[in-house]
Amino acid sequence: MKKLIFITVFNNINYVRMLSLLVKTLYIYGNIDEDTHILIYTSTQFKYFIENSQFYSKKIHLFINDNYNTIDSACKARLDLFDYELIDEYEKILYLDTDILVQKNINFIFDLIEENKIYAFGEGDISNDKDDFFGGKSLFINEINNYKDKSAFNSGVMLFNNCFEIKNLFKIIKNHMLKNKSAKFNDQPYFVYNAKKYNLINNTILNNYVELTNQMPKTNKAILHISGGPGIYKNKLNIMIIYFNHMLKNTTIMKK
């Protein structure tokens, strides 16, 4: 069974620096097996930096697009996943934002999938969404009370099967964004709205293995997502560098 870790990086060279830290932790701590590849969706400009970096290896495949030059388009680039010409070779997919570090073996993560749904970290509530991070104000609006479960999720870590249901969901989200531009927090509100609408979300299982924080992490969970908003990189990158060096100094502790 071939598995894919999917990462996108566009627009800002500092996100290539984050990518470097993420990929290094995948190698050192994630212990990804030989059947797991890393697909990096990026530009020709960043392709040069990646291919000449210390972390570049035969595990990495590059998917190139030179049309994304804004924060908004860079965030939405992940919706192109199923346009990758070799995507059908992979059975399971783990999408990761670049502002992530891995501090434990993550091979087991792929085995958590039980249904053809997106598995994501639970965050927020569509009925209490004053900043509209999850589409509560712009997309759900009067539909909120249609949902007994009003919990939302963070789209920075998403795990799913390579299946018709998810491929179709990505298509639906793309079309929704073209027709309705009311949501301002990039594509995350559209992920939340449509995944809930079509009952294609599990936002509980990954909570045991993913930590979302905007401070120095204090957890032994496998995946650390340093939050802070799209395009806001300075604090995130600083935390990632400091914590990565901490991990290197405490390798035996972190890998337990």
Label the model's feature ranges:
Residues 76-132:
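GT-A fold catalytic core of metal-dependent nucleotide-sugar glycosyltransferases
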Residues 17-20, 76, 80, 185-193:
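A structural signal for well-ordered alpha-helical segments within the folded catalytic domains
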Residues 42-48, 104-106, 208-211:
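Short, polar loop motifs at secondary-structure junctions
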Residues 1-69, 88-89, 227-256:
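N-terminal anchoring/stem segment of glycosyltransferases
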Residues 111-176:
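Conserved catalytic core of nucleotide-sugar-dependent glycosyltransferases
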Residues 148-233:
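Catalytic core and acceptor-binding pocket of nucleotide-sugar-dependent glycosyltransferases
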Residues 69-74, 127-134, 233-236:
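Short, charged, surface-exposed secondary-structure boundary motifs
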Residues 48-55, 111-112, 216-218:
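Short loop/helix-cap segments at secondary-structure boundaries that form the rim of catalytic
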